[in-house]
Amino acid sequence: MGVRAQQKERTRRSLIEAAFSQLSAERSFASLSLREVSREAGIAPTSFYRHFRDVDELGLTMVDESGLMLRQLMRQARQRIAKGGSVIRTSVSTFMEFIGNNPNAFRLLLRERSGTSAAFRAAVAREIQHFIAELADYLELENHMPRSFTEAQAEAMVTIVFSAGAEVLDVDIEQRRQLEERLVLQLRMISKGAYYWYRREQEKLAASRVE
């Protein structure tokens, strides 16, 4: 990559980070302006268009980055699990670590999931579906269950995890610890329920063949 290309990439990165830094519990992406983001990144507003067509394209890039960041962290968690440790507890700790280190990235996913922009809703839905698919792949490999079961289990787990994440954004350390423990319990219940449901279906199938 040449010097100019490197500089362009650094400026693009600065715009993304500037936009993330301006998000908060009180401020959503929709309230950001091109001028504010450009000023925070240290460039002229007119230079913004060398990197993004408009603010919406910047936002969609941020959604993609947030989803990818979360998936990469969860992949690392699965690598740690392979070396020993509780699957669910390690996954929950990793997820909470993501929220703690990247609260605005998670806020963006939460808000735009049900926001007014169809493009943003579709982008967040796509990221969540990627997350569900990767978890379903892992469950299918580890638990030796059919895809239909692991997808249903993964979707239930991701729904609960995102709901808990929304609560974690606004609590203190002790409340966060309690939420983590509750989430671990809920995910274990889903996991055991999926296993016993699958086993029951297998027993029913075996019985029907005997008859």
Curated annotation (Swiss-Prot):
GO molecular function terms listed in the Swiss-Prot or TrEMBL record: DNA binding; DNA-binding transcription factor activity
Pfam families: TetR_C_46, TetR_N
UniProt domain HTH tetR-type: residue ranges: 10-70
Alphabetically ordered keywords of this record: Cytoplasm, DNA-binding, Fatty acid biosynthesis, Fatty acid metabolism, Lipid biosynthesis, Lipid metabolism, Repressor, Transcription, Transcription regulation
GO biological process entries: fatty acid biosynthetic process; negative regulation of fatty acid biosynthetic process
Superkingdom, natural source: Bacteria
Residue ranges for the DNA-binding region feature of this UniProt entry: 33-52
NCBIfam families named among the record's database cross-references: PRK11202.1
Summary of the function given for this chain in its UniProt record: Represses the transcription of fabB, involved in unsaturated fatty acid (UFA) biosynthesis. By controlling UFA production, FabR directly influences the physical properties of the membrane bilayer.
PANTHER family: HTH-TYPE TRANSCRIPTIONAL REPRESSOR FABR
The protein's name in its UniProt record: HTH-type transcriptional repressor FabR
